[in-house]
């Protein structure tokens, strides 16, 4: 391969540019300013700090219904160490908890108690449905079991399984943390032109019902 060397004339008029005309110098100045001076709105950075704090310090409410609660408490042992995600502080009072895990079978007699405990939690608050019984009633398709806790509570994360493993519970925490980081409003109450009102958030089960109803092929347990 042949190379051609050309000498640069430093005194030519084409190479003489002022600092304002030099694009590389302008780009360097802009990068220096953007890296040292925050030019955005203060409320944006404050919201990001608040969401970071909420996502990394999720305190669960100590509440269990049946066997899924055993798997939930297993995640607090040294083997799984859920303290890595700031969620090891189990609270005995709903007023001190950030989210509630419905771990087990929600019976109809227990539904008013669960709803009352949820109402006692302070905003912002979240709900994790853990296990098949909490998600859809599981194998208890009977009169005494609520067919899904989202019948009376807004659920943020669903954990499939009967019962789910502790790793599934940890993954649900990470999904909840990711969802908190994407929230556009700090609380579930919205201050609008017509006053203060609460957002009517549709449950994921209801939103995805039509899509899931179109499924005609279901895998057998041997294929899973």
Curated annotation (Swiss-Prot):
Catalytic activity, EC: 7.1.1.-
| Cofactor (UniProt) | [4Fe-4S] cluster
Where does the UniProt entry say this protein principally localizes? membrane
Look up and give the membrane topology term: Peripheral membrane protein
Q: Which SUPFAM superfamilies match?
A: HydA/Nqo6-like
Q: What does the note accompanying the cofactor annotation read? A: Binds 1 [4Fe-4S] cluster.
Compartments, record wording: Cell membrane
Question: What does the record give under GO molecular function?
Answer: 4 iron, 4 sulfur cluster binding; iron ion binding; NADH dehydrogenase (ubiquinone) activity; NADH:ubiquinone reductase (non-electrogenic) activity; quinone binding
**Gene3D superfamilies the UniProt entry points to:** 3.40.50.12280
Give the UniProt keywords, A-Z: 4Fe-4S, Cell membrane, Iron, Iron-sulfur, Membrane, Metal-binding, NAD, Quinone, Translocase, Transport, Ubiquinone
Which Pfam families does this entry report, sorted A to Z? Oxidored_q6
Biological process GO annotation list? aerobic respiration; electron transport coupled proton transport
List cellular component terms (GO): plasma membrane; respiratory chain complex I
- Enumerate the catalysed reactions: a quinone + NADH + 5 H(+)(in) = a quinol + NAD(+) + 4 H(+)(out)
Q: Which InterPro entries match?
A: NADH_UbQ_OxRdtase-like_20kDa, NADH_UQ_OxRdtase_20Kd_su
Q: Which PROSITE patterns match?
A: COMPLEX1_20K (PS01150)
The entry's [4Fe-4S] cluster-binding residues are: 67-68, 133, 162
Q: What does this protein do?
A: NDH-1 shuttles electrons from NADH, via FMN and iron-sulfur (Fe-S) centers, to quinones in the respiratory chain. The immediate electron acceptor for the enzyme in this species is believed to be ubiquinone. Couples the redox reaction to proton translocation (for every two electrons transferred, four hydrogen ions are translocated across the cytoplasmic membrane), and thus conserves the redox energy in a proton gradient.
Assigned protein family: Belongs to the complex I 20 kDa subunit family.
Q: Could you give the subunit structure recorded for this chain? A: NDH-1 is composed of 14 different subunits. Subunits NuoB, C, D, E, F, and G constitute the peripheral sector of the complex.
Q: What is this protein called?
A: NADH-quinone oxidoreductase subunit B
Name the species this protein comes from: Baumannia cicadellinicola subsp. Homalodisca coagulata
Q: Which gene encodes it?
A: nuoB
């Amino acid at each position: 391969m042949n190379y051609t060397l050309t000498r640069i004339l430093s005194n030519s008029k084409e190479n003489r540019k002022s600092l304002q005309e030099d694009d590389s110098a302008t780009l360097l100045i802009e990068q220096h300013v953007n890296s040292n001076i925050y030019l955005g709105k203060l409320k944006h950075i404050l919201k990001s700090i608040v969401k970071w704090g909420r996502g990394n310090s999720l305190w669960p409410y100590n509440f269990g219904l049946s066997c899924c609660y055993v798997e939930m408490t297993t995640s607090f042992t040294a083997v799984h160490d859920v303290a890595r995600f700031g969620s090891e502080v189990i609270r005995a009072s709903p007023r001190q908890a950030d989210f509630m895990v419905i771990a087990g079978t929600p019976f109809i007699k227990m539904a008013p108690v669960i709803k009352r405990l949820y109402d006692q939690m302070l905003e912002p608050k979240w709900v994790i449905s853990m296990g098949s019984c909490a998600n859809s009633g599981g194998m208890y398709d009977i009169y005494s079991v609520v067919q899904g806790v989202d019948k009376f509570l807004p659920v943020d994360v669903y954990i499939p399984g009967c019962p789910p493993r502790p790793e599934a519970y940890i993954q649900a925490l990470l999904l909840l943390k990711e969802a908190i980081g994407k929230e556009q409003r700090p609380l579930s109450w919205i201050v609008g032109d017509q006053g203060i009102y609460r957002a009517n958030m549709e449950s994921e089960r209801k939103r995805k019902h039509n899509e899931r109803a179109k499924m005609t092929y279901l895998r057998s347990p041997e294929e899973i």
